[in-house]
Amino acid sequence: MIITKTPFRMSFFGGGTDMPSFFNEHGGAVISTTFDKYCYVNVRHMPPFHPYISELVHNRFERVNNVEDIEHPLIRECMKMHDIHEIRLTYEGDLPARTGLGTSSTFAVGMLNAFCALKGKMMSKRQLAQEAIHVERNVLKEHGGWQDQVAAAYGGLNRIDFHDHDFSVRPIIISPERKKELDDNLLLFYTGVQRFSSEIQADTFAKPVDKTKQLLDMLALVNEAEKVLTDKEKSLNEFGKLLDTTWKLKRGTGSKVSNGSIDELYDMALKAGALGGKLLGAGGGGFLLFYCEKEKQEYLKNALEKLMIVPFNFENDGTQVLYYSPQSYSPRKEIILK
């Protein structure tokens, strides 16, 4: 049996510039962090006496006798990629899917990590990110960027740069005290709305209107935000104000990024004392993140009392094998269906 634990991520700056159609021409960068909410993937080989080959438990329950019959496209293609057969796989997440936290890519990274361990192989964080990007973007042709896979694999508070069909990861150098202050001043609220990121990304980049200027402005904010984080003489409140700036830019990149309800909640938060914030992910729903000084946080919580607040702390580990107990495996010779 193999169990992997892979963190979800929140992206602060640069979202949209991690799309190959943009960064291969202009370069791209994001600042993001993983936090202590995870997806867990449990994989083991099936005993040979069951009348089915594989059993998969995700948002649905599947029992199949052929990998090609698997309905979940990500599971199916990852199994084919690593020649995985006769398994029982279960997925559990601390937070709901399609909510702007990179859940699909986190699942991809965690599942690939588990499959490699099942095969007795070790893969680097870079290799796991590259494989997850390949299966989601090239094999499944899902529209989206690269940052989610990289963040889930590496973990931590990082600047991720994208260029020439490649990426590089650089940790943000920040004192533990300053990092804790940032952590303490960020509040996460669940709107209760789920959506498909790939559909919103496709809408954003399929429109004939050129979004290059907004994306270049969002890219420039990555440098500004990094300077705020790493310069101990600067107030972290500037980070919150930059979040407000990047959110306003992001809203201009697609009609599905926000809606009237989200805009109303955002305005309520600013009036209650938040310095800035954003809707995480591609937009359309999910989680709202706000930067708010501690002395004003009760006002913010009261203003958004209809939303669920999700306590969190930053984490640094990225995907990891939590439990490793390998099994001997031989393909079954005959399947008797009942």
Where in this protein do the model-derived segments appear?
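C-terminal nucleotide
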Residues: M1-F13, D18-N24, V30-S32, Y38-D83, ...
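Glycine-rich active-site/cofactor-binding loop and its immediate structural neighborhood
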Residues: G285
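Short helix-coil transition sites and intra-membrane helix breaks within transmembrane domains
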Residues: T99-G102, R251
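Metal-dependent C-N hydrolase catalytic cores
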Residues: E62, P96, A108-M111
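N-terminal pre-triad scaffold of radical SAM enzymes
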Residues: L89-A97
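Short secondary-structure capping/junction motifs at helix and strand boundaries
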Residues: E86-T90, K121-L128
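DPxDG-like acidic metal-binding loop motif
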Residues: L101-K125, G156
